[in-house]
Amino acid sequence: MEPLISPQPRFRLQPIPENPSSSSSSASITIPRSISNTSFFHEISQERLLLHHQDLEQSVQDDKEDQDSDSDETNRFLSQTRPLHRSRTAPAMVIIKDLRTKPPETKKPSPVSKSIIRQAIFLLIVYLTLGVSIYSFNRDHYSGIETHPVVDALYFCIVTMCTIGYGDIAPLTPWTKIFAVVFVLFGFGFLDILLSGVVNYVLDLQESMILTGIQTRQHHQHHHHHRFSAKDYIIDFEKGRMRIRMKVCLALCVVVLCIGVGALVLHFVEELGFVDSVYLSVMSVTTVGYGDRAFKTLQGRLFAAVWLLVSTLAVARAFLYLAEARIDRRHRKAVKLALNREITVDDLLKADTYQHGFISKSEYIVLKLKEMGKITQKDIDQVVIQFEKLDPNQIGKITLPDLLGDPL
């Protein structure tokens, strides 16, 4: 039988005896220790791991060298100063500036209101000057108790312009009657509108001053927690204006004040009784003017020239605020009903503008705004026309180049 050969090729091949006991008898043959297959593959794997680890170290070192070279090139590139050109598709700096949040500002009267005040004062002076001049040169053509020509003329002009019509001073001749007709129409139709603009300006100025004072105090106390207080009944902080009911209360207080002041003057100057003083004061403020009572003294007519002008406008403003409050209350009810009403199939079909079988959030908002009465289809059509003007390419979008006038 042939002897077994060791499978490990890197060792010198030596014969392995078949019987181990015969090793003692043969001294010329040396028998090495046999190596198993497990230890053989284990040594090979260790060598491979060692080689792989060396390769990894070499690759890491190469990467570091590449990074160093790239950083050197980048530094050399940055060291060379080059002008940066702004892309034409980048947002304009004006638009970016406008996108910054701005603190809320208190609404202030516009310069247009100031111009209306100047026009109203100028026309009022012209109106009164013309009336006083014509009355002064034609005193014999008017009936009534005379005190002073200028005072009587001013009193007559104010009573005519405010449409009170006491009847204590009235024209007698056709010429003075024609003048009275023109004077009434001109004063009632034009100057009264301008004076109402003056009242609006004064009230808006007062409102802005109140809002500014309250907002200033809140700015100093911003670290405190907001609690519901009496100021919330006066100011609508979300809309930045006084509440309607507060405006009505202020207007009514002004009316009561005018009635009280007029009654006191009538009682002490015209020497009327308490009931007659209040009666004439109310009839004058409300522009009823039965004519059974009127101002007869010089001091009373001077007072009436200023008091009637202020009080009649205050009463008109109070009635306007009352009407505004009723309309606002009606709108709130309509909004509440529109929000609580569930949408129907007909509503979905009407609101589905693009016939998709569903409505989006914007379409739902438009539907509810229509139900609330805040917008109409005419308003939507006007907005659509404006949108089409801003979208010259008719792509259904307004892009930045369209606004800047620089199409791509």
Curated annotation (Swiss-Prot):
What is the official name of this protein in its record? Two-pore potassium channel 5
Residues spanning the membrane = 116-136, 178-198, 249-269, 302-322
Superkingdom field? Eukaryota
Q: Which residues lie on this side of the membrane: Stromal?
A: 22-115, 199-248, 323-408
Could you state one GO cellular component term attached to this entry? plant-type vacuole membrane
Principal location: membrane
User: Self-association or partners: how does it assemble?
Assistant: Homodimer.
Q: Where is this region: Disordered?
A: 1-29, 58-82
What organism does the UniProt record list as the source? Answer: Arabidopsis thaliana (Mouse-ear cress)
Molecular function in Gene Ontology: metal ion binding; potassium channel activity
Annotated EF-hand domain ranges read 339-374, 378-408
Q: What is known of its domains?
A: Each of the two pore-forming region (also called P-domain or P-loop) is enclosed by two transmembrane segments (2P/4TM) and contains the GYGD signature motif which seems to be involved in potassium selectivity.
For this protein, the record's Pfam families field holds: Ion_trans_2
Q: Which SUPFAM superfamilies match?
A: Voltage-gated potassium channels
Q: How does it sit in the membrane?
A: Multi-pass membrane protein
Comp. bias (Low complexity) = 15-29
Q: In what ranges is there compositional bias, type Acidic residues? A: 63-72
Q: What subcellular compartments does it reside in?
A: Vacuole membrane
Q: Which family does it belong to?
A: Belongs to the two pore domain potassium channel (TC 1.A.1.7) family.
| Biological role stated in the UniProt entry | Probable voltage-independent potassium-selective tonoplast ion channel.
The record's keywords, sorted A to Z, are:
Calcium, Ion channel, Ion transport, Membrane, Metal-binding, Potassium, Potassium channel, Potassium transport, Repeat, Transmembrane, Transmembrane helix, Transport, Vacuole
The intramembrane ranges come out as 152-171, 276-295
Q: In which tissues is it expressed?
A: Expressed in hydathodes and the vascular tissues of roots, stems, leaves and flowers.
Annotated Ca(2+) 2 binding lies at: 391, 393, 397, 402
